[in-house]
């Protein structure tokens, strides 16, 4: 939850992930503009790569607004690997399975780069290496 209580506050929620096999996830991103948070801006964005017929993705964005002069936005990009990208990899002798790993790792590594705290970024990097 991004809670805006004062004037001219900013928030940005970025959720990114990869779902494979029979995995599932629920994302409830909430931006809450409280009374007194005039001139505030809140945004939430989600990017999910679906890699399996049995994955379940649930996205529930919510913007609460008790103030008039605010800007709130939300968006989601959810989908499978594009055929053109798969063709690109296959034309270079890279299997579909390896292509999926490369793309999934790249998406998750981007989260590490966007993380300001070095210890957190390193911890995330270690988990990505273990999982993929």
PLM-predicted stretches and their roles:
Residues 1-132:
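Active-site gating/interface segments in enzymes
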């Amino acid at each position: 939850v991004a809670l805006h209580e004062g004037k001219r506050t900013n928030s940005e929620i970025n959720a990114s992930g990869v779902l494979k096999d029979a995995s599932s996830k629920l994302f409830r991103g909430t931006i809450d503009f409280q009374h007194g948070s005039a001139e505030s801006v809140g945004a939430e964005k989600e990017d999910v790569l679906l890699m399996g017929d049995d994955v379940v993705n649930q996205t529930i964005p919510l913007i609460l607004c008790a103030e008039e002069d605010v800007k709130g936005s939300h968006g989601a990009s959810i989908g499978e690997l594009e055929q053109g990208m798969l063709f690109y990899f296959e034309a270079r002798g890279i299997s579909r399975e390896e292509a999926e790993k490369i793309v999934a790792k790249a998406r998750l590594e981007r989260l590490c780069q966007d993380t300001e705290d070095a210890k957190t970024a390193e911890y995330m990097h270690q988990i990505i290496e273990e999982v993929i």
